[in-house]
Amino acid sequence: MRPEDASSRWIRPREPEEAAAIAIVAYLRGYGPASVDNFHNWLSRGRVSTRQVRKWFASVGDRLREVEVGGERRYVLAEDLDELLSTKPTKAVRLLPGFDQYVLGPGTDDPHVLPAARRRAVSQQSGWIAPIVVAGGVVRGTWKIAADNVQVAWFSEAGAVPRSGLRAEVERLSTILGRDLGLAVN
């Protein structure tokens, strides 16, 4: 049965150019500032040409603003620019689950989110994405639960371990899971 025959509420799929503009705006709302490559990888992992993706970005036009992040051109929604510019860097520590959108959105190959040297620690065999420790907006380690402990593998180059922030996150996780958990840092 064809979808339009199955439901009177069926809406025809949009043309690719129209759908792309909607997707770019939604993507940048969630993950901006982001590069064309970030969006391209998130959308299709190379199934659409880079040239086509660039055309789609150009078609969004004045709704986007270019910004520089670490010497690279990124895009943000024009309406979000002032808020972005007034945002202060965070020192927050978070334990995020495997396959979290924090790394899937920009992609594990974005060095602003995940240091390149640690990509294999997060993006593992058979497509597994490990649970991550984010501190100061950057992936600083991985974690897992073993017995009654949250075992954190803190990246040595990430500096001092933020133990109080990690303890607070383990406490939060304990509440969510309904069981007491300890903290072990490697």
Model-derived regions: residue spans:
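Long, low-complexity intrinsically disordered regions
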Residues: M1-V103, T108-N186
